[in-house]
Curated annotation (Swiss-Prot):
GO terms under cellular component: cytoplasm; ribonuclease H2 complex
HAMAP family reported in the protein's UniProt record: RNase_HII_B
Native species: Desulforamulus reducens (strain ATCC BAA-1160 / DSM 100696 / MI-1)
Chief place of localization: cytoplasm
Catalysed conversion reaction: Endonucleolytic cleavage to 5'-phosphomonoester
Transmembrane segments: none
Co-factor binding comment: Manganese or magnesium. Binds 1 divalent metal ion per monomer in the absence of substrate. May bind a second metal ion after substrate binding.
GO BP: any one term: DNA replication, removal of RNA primer
One Gene Ontology molecular-function label: RNA binding
Protein name: Ribonuclease HII
Length: 198
C-alpha cells in the first residue's frame, strides 16, 4: 500500500509568531469530501473539515518552528524545519511526500514539491486545513493577550489596521523583529520618525 503524505505550512507571510506546518496521510478507505486550499474555505468549513481529517486520516501531525527560530534561521529555513518536524511526527511512515510550493524539507523519504498542490493533492489540502485551523486558534489566543493589535481579524498579516496598531503601540513581544517593516518601525521610533506608516 502506497502511503502518500501531504505537507503544507501557514504563517510565512505573517509578521508575528512562528510557522505552523502539518503533515497528513489520508485513508483511501475514508475519502473526505470538500478538501481544497484552506484559503478558499470559510473558517467554519475549515474547522469542520479539520475534525473530519483528524478522525479519518491514517496519521497527521501539526508542528511549529518558533518565533525565535524564525528570527535566527530566517523564514525560509524555519518553514522547512516546521515541515520536517511535521513529517517526522507522523505515527506511521509515508512512502512518498508531497509538499505545497517549490521547496522541500530534508527528509529521507522520496518527496516532490507541487506548486498550488493544496488545490491539487487531497493530502496537501488536508495538511493545509490542519495547519491553518491550528494557527488561527493561536491567533485568537494572542488576541486575548494583545487585543490592541487585532490579531483575531488579520491573523498577524500586515494589513492597514495592523500597521496603524503598530504605529500607535509599537511591536509586541511576538512580532518578528527581523522583518523589515517591524525593524524599520523600531529604528523609526529610535529616531522619532515613522513615516513608513503614514
Amino acid at each position: 500500500m502506497v502511503l502518500e503524505c501531504g505537507v503544507d505550512e501557514t504563517g510565512r507571510g505573517s509578521c508575528i509568531s512562528g510557522i505552523y506546518a502539518s503533515a497528513c496521510i489520508l485513508d483511501p478507505a475514508h475519502p473526505i469530501e470538500g478538501l481544497r486550499d484552506s484559503k478558499k474555505l470559510s473558517a467554519r468549513k475549515r474547522e469542520i473539515l479539520a475534525e473530519e481529517i483528524k478522525q479519518y486520516a491514517l496519521s497527521w501531525c501539526i508542528a511549529q518552528a518558533s518565533l525565535e527560530e524564525v528570527e535566527q534561521l530566517n523564514v525560509h529555513h524555519a518553514t522547512l524545519l516546521a515541515m520536517k518536524r511535521a513529517i517526522e511526527g507522523l505515527s506511521i511512515r509515508a512512502n512518498k511526500v508531497y509538499v505545497d510550493g517549490i521547496h522541500l524539507p530534508e527528509v529521507d523519504i522520496p518527496a516532490e514539491a507541487i506548486v498550488k498542490g493544496d488545490d491539487l493533492i487531497p493530502a496537501i489540502s488536508a495538511a493545509s486545513i490542519l495547519a491553518k485551523v491550528a494557527r488561527d486558534g493561536a491567533m485568537l489566543e494572542y488576541h486575548e493577550k494583545y487585543p490592541q493589535y487585532g490579531f483575531n481579524s488579520h491573523k498577524g498579516y500586515l494589513t492597514k489596521a495592523h500597521r496603524e496598531a503598530l504605529k500607535k503601540y509599537g511591536p509586541s513581544p511576538i512580532h518578528r523583529k527581523t522583518y523589515a517593516p517591524i525593524r524599520e518601525l523600531l529604528v523609526g521610533k529610535d529616531n522619532e520618525q515613522i513615516e513608513m506608516f503614514e
